[in-house]
C-alpha cells in the first residue's frame, strides 16, 4: 500500500489524529509509535486528541542507535550493516515497539531531517517508515523536501496517514 501525500494534502495533522482515534475505536485497534527523526511528534499529535489513552498507551523516542537497541530490540548487526535510516531498521523498530507495548499496529520512523547528516545514498529529507506489528511490516521510503522542521512535520503527517489508511482499510472504508 504505497502512500502518496497528494491524496491527503488537505488533511491537517489534527484531523488525521482525530481520524486515527475514530478508526481505532471502529476496529478495536491500539497503536504505538517508534520515532527517531520526528522526536516524539507522532505521539504528541496522537495524544492531542482527548480520549487517546483508550488506544495509545505508549510511544518510544529512540534517537540514538543505542536507544534503538535498548528500547526496541534493533540488532547491532542491522545498524552496522544497513544504518539507522533503512528499511531493515524501521522494521525492527516497529516490531519491537509492538512487542513491548502490546499494540496491534505501530509505526516507526527514521530519517535524515538535516540540515546536515545526508549522504549520496541518503540525502537530507530521506525518511523510512514501517507500519505493522511484531509479525509483519510494510516499509516505504520517502523523500520529504524542506528545512529540518518541514521534514519532521511532513514525516509526522506521513506516519499518521499510514496508520489511518491501514485502519480505515480494515474497517471497510476507503
Where in this protein do the model-derived segments appear?
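Short alpha-helical segments enriched in small residues
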Residues: 1-174
Amino acid at each position: 500500500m504505497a502512500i502518496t501525500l497528494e491524496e491527503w494534502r488537505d488533511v491537517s495533522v489534527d484531523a488525521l489524529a482525530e481520524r486515527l482515534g475514530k478508526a481505532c475505536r471502529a476496529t478495536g485497534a491500539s497503536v504505538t509509535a517508534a520515532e527517531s527523526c520526528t522526536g516524539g511528534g507522532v505521539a504528541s499529535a496522537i495524544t492531542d486528541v482527548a480520549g487517546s489513552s483508550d488506544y495509545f498507551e505508549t510511544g518510544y523516542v529512540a534517537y540514538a542507535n543505542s536507544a534503538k537497541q535498548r528500547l526496541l530490540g534493533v540488532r547491532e548487526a542491522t545498524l552496522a550493516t544497513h544504518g539507522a535510516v533503512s528499511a531493515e531498521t524501521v522494521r525492527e523498530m516497529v516490531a519491537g515497539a509492538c512487542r513491548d507495548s502490546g499494540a496491534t499496529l505501530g509505526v516507526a520512523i527514521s530519517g535524515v531531517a538535516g540540515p546536515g547528516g545526508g549522504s549520496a545514498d541518503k540525502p537530507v529529507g530521506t525518511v523510512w517508515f514501517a507500519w505493522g506489528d511484531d509479525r509483519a511490516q510494510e516499509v516505504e521510503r520517502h523523500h520529504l523536501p524542506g528545512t529540518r522542521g518541514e521534514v519532521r512535520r511532513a514525516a509526522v503527517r506521513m506516519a499518521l496517514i499510514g496508520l489511518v489508511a491501514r485502519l480505515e482499510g480494515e474497517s471497510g472504508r476507503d
